[in-house]
């Protein structure tokens, strides 16, 4: 007889109405992990302005997101992810860790470059900061278009050319994608709204990656509304003057 699964509940930041999902890439990351694991779980949005007594008791002063697994409360996104990968394991649940270590780090500096770009109010610095963001996106594009070791046929003398894989580590979503995609989504939405900047079409690997990601329910259905992201960055994005 199969072992009964403990109750799993993810507490995430609520949006501006106090109910729908708010802008938080860490919350979306864990939402995606749980969905990909195929585990039964609940998601509870927490209005940060009015934390309920239940939430305060479970995680007094705790940062969102946090996880309730049975009676255990888990905090810290990285630790929660490690915990879920360890307890929700094969054969019952899929392993989500990337095979290639580079998949975990590729594109990770994009968000820092984006933050510097969007927070800058000095027009004289704008071009250089935009170039920094483009450079980081190009590094990701190069990784996505370069074949992974498992895509290379060592018996063939022909050049393997451009990788056609769907995601960072292959054709399935992994923990690496759960980490990067929510941040890339924010970059797209905020840069378009506050800088009129879009990811260049020349970055075909990045566009293919995002197109494949938006076709997956685990990503598309866990994204907050664009308006929530724009609102979260209203005070952060500095006008150039």
Curated annotation (Swiss-Prot):
The chain crosses the membrane at residues 26-46. This is Chloride intracellular channel protein 1. PANTHER family: CHLORIDE INTRACELLULAR CHANNEL PROTEIN (PTHR45476:SF2), CHLORIDE INTRACELLULAR CHANNEL PROTEIN 6-RELATED (PTHR45476). A motif (G-site) lies at residues 24-27. The modification N6-acetyllysine is found at residues 13, 119, 131. The modification Phosphotyrosine is found at residue 233. Expressed in neonatal and adult cardiomyocytes (at protein level). The modification N-acetylalanine is found at residue 2. GO terms for cellular component: chloride channel complex; cytoplasm; endoplasmic reticulum; extracellular exosome; membrane; mitochondrial membrane; mitochondrion; nuclear envelope. Signal peptide: none annotated. Disulfide bonds join 24-59. It is a single-pass membrane protein. The keyword Ion transport applies. One of its GO terms (molecular function) is voltage-gated chloride channel activity. The active G-site contains a monothiol Cys-X-X-Ser motif which mediates glutathione-dependent redox catalysis. Members of this family may change from a globular, soluble state to a state where the N-terminal domain is inserted into the membrane and functions as a channel. The redox status of the active cysteine in Cys-X-X-Cys/Ser motif likely determines the capacity to adopt a soluble or membrane-inserted state. A conformation change of the N-terminal domain is thought to expose hydrophobic surfaces that trigger membrane insertion. It catalyses: L-dehydroascorbate + 2 glutathione = glutathione disulfide + L-ascorbate; chloride(in) = chloride(out); iodide(out) = iodide(in); thiocyanate(in) = thiocyanate(out). GO terms for biological process: chloride transport; positive regulation of osteoblast differentiation; regulation of mitochondrial membrane potential. In the soluble state, catalyzes glutaredoxin-like thiol disulfide exchange reactions with reduced glutathione as electron donor. Reduces selenite and dehydroascorbate and may act as an antioxidant during oxidative stress response. Can insert into membranes and form voltage-dependent multi-ion conductive channels. Membrane insertion seems to be redox-regulated and may occur only under oxidizing conditions. Involved in regulation of the cell cycle. Its main location: nucleus. It is an enzyme of class 1 (oxidoreductase). CDD domains: GST_C_CLIC1 (cd10300), GST_N_CLIC (cd03061). It is found in: Nucleus; Nucleus membrane; Cytoplasm; Cell membrane.
